[in-house]
């Protein structure tokens, strides 16, 4: 609802709180994303995980390598308002009550799949173990459970601790990591298992999925907003 909250703005950057910015954020704001509604980075963790990839393709209804992470968004607010995206979102949510594992992220991917500009991966680097290492990350997103204030040896943790040391919260953060014990870590592992199990159950279940609702995608043609179902007629 950022577009409605700030009607005087035509563009905005949204960033999750579990992030570290290593470059001038104005560079992200200045990216030319053409006529796209959103600029975002592909979610490599979700796309490479077998269960989540199955979920993306069967529930969200898009290809796994087109699914983006909504933790960092460049937003074309004029286009979002033009498409009445907030109203469409509320209508879909009220009518279908989609079951999903990442509600806001899934809605953006399902509704706006053809309106997303893929940003350079350096603008949303996630510390997933086994993933591609980015030598010069512009923005690090400590997504899911890989938080350096909870765990040691997290990829890109040095950037977080560099800035933490310059803040007044460094001693508290060190204490918090030391106190994050076996019970908390076990809970994280169990929660990840539950998330994956839920994704699998939704994908293989009989409930209404985003992919079942053809008209949920937005097509903007010469300033006139239509559902993709209309565009196909």
Language-model features: locations:
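A short linear-motif detector with a strong N-terminal bias
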Residues: 16-20, 50-54, 96-98, 117-122
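Short, surface-exposed, charged loop/turn segments at secondary-structure junctions
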Residues: 29, 54-55, 87-92
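A short acidic (Asp/Glu
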Residues: 25, 51, 129-130
């Amino acid at each position: 609802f950022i577009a409605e909250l700030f009607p005087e703005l035509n563009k905005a950057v949204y960033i999750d709180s579990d992030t570290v910015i290593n470059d001038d954020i104005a560079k992200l704001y200045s990216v030319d994303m053409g006529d796209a509604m959103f600029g975002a980075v592909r979610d490599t963790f979700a796309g490479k995980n077998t269960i989540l990839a199955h979920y993306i393709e069967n529930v969200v209804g898009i290809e796994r390598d087109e699914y983006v992470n909504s933790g960092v968004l460049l937003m074309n607010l004029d286009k979002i308002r033009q498409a009445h995206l907030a109203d469409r979102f509320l209508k879909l949510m009220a009518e279908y009550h989609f079951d999903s594992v990442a509600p806001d992220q899934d809605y953006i991917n399902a509704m706006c799949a053809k309106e997303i500009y893929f940003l350079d991966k350096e603008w949303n680097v996630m510390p997933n173990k086994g993933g591609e290492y980015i030598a010069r990350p512009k923005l690090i997103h400590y997504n899911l459970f890989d938080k350096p204030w909870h765990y040691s040896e997290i990829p890109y943790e040095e950037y977080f601790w560099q800035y933490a040391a310059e803040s007044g919260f460094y001693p508290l953060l060190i204490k918090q990591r030391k106190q994050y014990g076996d019970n908390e870590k076990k809970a994280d592992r169990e929660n990840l298992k539950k998330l994956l199990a839920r994704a699998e159950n939704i994908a293989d279940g009989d409930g209404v999925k985003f992919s079942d609702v053809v008209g949920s995608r937005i097509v903007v043609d010469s300033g006139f907003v239509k559902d993709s179902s209309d565009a196909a007629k």
